[in-house]
Amino acid sequence: MIKSLKFSHKILLAAALVVIATFSLFTLYNDSLQRASIREDLEDYLHEMGEITASNVQNWLSGRILLIENLAQTLARDHSPETTQALLEQPLLGSTFLFTYLGQTDGTYTARPTSDLPADYDPRRRPWYNAATSAGQTTLTEPYMEPAIHELVLTIASPARQGGQPFGVVGGDLSLQTVVKIINSLDFGGMGYAFLVSGDGKILVHPDKDQVMKSLSDVYPRNTPKIGSGFSEAELHGNTRILSFSPVKGLSGLDWYIGISVDKDKAYAMLTKLRTSAIVAALIAVVAIVLLLGMLIRVLMQPLTDMGRAMQDIAQGEGDLTKRLKVTSNDEFGALAISFNRFVERIHESIREVAGTARQLHDVAQLVVNASNSSMANSDEQSNRTNSVAAAINELGAAAQEIARNAADASHHASDANHQAEDGKQVVEQTIRAMNELSEKISASCANIEALNSRTVNIGQILEVIKGISEQTNLLALNAAIEAARAGEAGRGFAVVADEVRNLAHRAQESAQQIQKMIEELQIGAQEAVSTMTESQRYSLESVEIANRAGERLSSVTGRIAEIDGMNQSVATATEEQTAVVDSLNMDITEINTLNQEGVENLQATLRACGELETQAGRLRQLVDSFKI
C-alpha cells in the first residue's frame, strides 16, 4: 500500500507521523507532570484538611474535658449534697452533656438529669469510674451506641480529690453529634468525605451510618488501608479510593484519627480534561501542519511534476527522441533534467544504429528461410526410401524370430520332458531305497518281537515263583492264626495280623494269575505280528524288483529326450544368430531413419526459428520506425 503512494504523499505521511509522535511524547510528558502536580496538591490539601479537622475535634473535646475537670475541682472544695445538686444542674452542663454525675467512694451516685436506675446500681463498678481511678487523671471512654437516643455517646470521667485523697469520680456523657457535624461539614467538591476512626481500625463516625462501628477490613476487604502517615489506595464498590489519616492529638486515653476518602477518578478528573484538551489540540495541530506541508510540497514539487509530464510525453507519445527537457534551475531538479537529456541523446543514437541493423537482419532471415525449404524437400525423399528398406528388413526379422521361437518352444518342451523323466527316475530310486529300508526295519521288528516273546517266558517263570511264595505265605498265615486261636485272649492281636497277611498273600496270588494271563495273550499277539511282518517283507522285496525295472525304462527315455533336446537347441542357436544379424541390420536402418527424422525436425525448427526471426525483425523495424530519429 505504501509503495503505491505518491512521493509527495509519502513525505506528508512521514511528516504527519513525526508530528504525531512529537505531540504524543509531549502529551505523555505533560500528563506525567500534571499527574505528579495534582497528586502533590491533593496530598497537601488532604493533609491540611485532616489536620484542621483533627484540631477542631480536639478543641471541641478539650473544652468539654475542662468543664468536667473544673466541676471536679469545685466539688473537691464542697461536695455536700446541696452543692453537688446545684453544680450538676448548671445550664451550661445541661446544654453540653446528656448526663452529668458524681460517683463517690461510698457508692453514692448523683446525676442530673435524673433517671431510673436499678436498686443495686453501684458507680464504683462502672468502667468510667474504674478507668479514671486507675489512671488518676481525666479519661475518655470508647464511643458506644446509646439505645435510648440511638446516638454515639462518649463518657468523660475525672477523679475528684479532697486533701489529696480521692472521694469520687465526676463524669459526663457527651453526644458525638457535634463531632459528626464537624466531620460531615467538610466539603471536598463532591470528590469524597471524612470519617472518624479509632487506632484499632473501628469506624466511629461516617456519613454512611451502615459503616459505623465496622472495621476498616470489613469496609475495604481488599487492600485494607493502614492507619498512619502517608496515603494509600483501596477498592470500594469497584472504585479506587485515596485515603489519608490525621491523628487527633492531645486527648489522653484516646487514639483517634480523621480519615479522608477521595474518589481517585474524580480527583484526577482535571487531568482527564487536560489530557483530552491536549489530544484535541495535537490533532488540530497535526491537521494544520499537514495542510501547510501539503501546499508547500505541491509548490516545491512542481518542477518534478513538469519533468514527469515531459517523460510521459516521450514514453507514451510519438516516440520523438528529438525532444529535450528545459533546464530552468540549478538545483537537484535541474541536474536531473540535464542527466535525462543526456540519456535521451544516447538512446537516440542507439535507436538509429538499431534501425540499420534491423533491415540487414530481415534480409538475412529471408535467405535462411529459402535454403531451409530446399533442404526440407530433399530430407523428405530420403526419409521415404529409408522407410521402405526398414519395412522389408522388419518382415525378414519377423520370420526368423518365428522360427527361433518355435525351436525354442520345442527345446523347452523337450527339456521339460527330460526334467520330468529325471524326476521320475529319482522318485523310483527313492522308492527302492524306501522299500529296502522298510524291509530292513521289518526284519529288525521281527527280531525284537522274538526277543520280547522270549522275555515274556522268563516273566512267566518269575510269576510261578511268586505264586509258590504266595501259597507258602498263605499256609504260614493260616498256621499263625491257628496258634493265635489256641493262645486265646493273648494272641488276638497276632491273629488279626496273621489274617491280614493271609489276605495279602491271597491278593498277590490273584494278581500273579492275572499277569500270567496277560503274558500269554501278549505271546499270542507277538507270534501273529511276526507272521504278518514276514509276509510284508516278502511283498516289499517284490516291489523293489518292479521299481528297478521301471527305473531302467525311465533311464532309456531320458537318453532319447536328451538327444531331441540337443537337436532343438542347435536349430534354435542357428535361428537366433540369423535373428541377431537381422536385428542389427534393422537397428542400423532405424538409426539412419532416426537421424534423418532428427535432421528433418532440426530443419523444421530452423525454418520456424527463421520465420520467428523474420517476424521479430519486422517487429523490430516497426518499433524502430515508431521513434522519430
Swiss-Prot record:
- Domain (Cache) ranges: 37-260
Q: Which GO terms describe its cellular component?
A: plasma membrane
Tell me the superkingdom of the source: Bacteria
Q: Which residues bind L-glutamine?
A: S115, Y121, R126, P127, W128, Y144, M145, E146, D173
Q: Where are the transmembrane segments?
A: 11-31, 277-297
* Role description: Chemotactic-signal transducers respond to changes in the concentration of attractants and repellents in the environment, transduce a signal from the outside to the inside of the cell, and facilitate sensory adaptation through the variation of the level of methylation. Responds to L-Arg, L-Gln, L-Ala, L-Glu, L-Lys, L-Met and L-Tyr. Also involved in repellent responses to trichloroethylene (TCE), chloroform and methylthiocyanate.
Name the chain's protein: Methyl-accepting chemotaxis protein PctB
Q: What is the lineage of its organism?
A: Bacteria, Pseudomonadati, Pseudomonadota, Gammaproteobacteria, Pseudomonadales
Its gene name is pctB
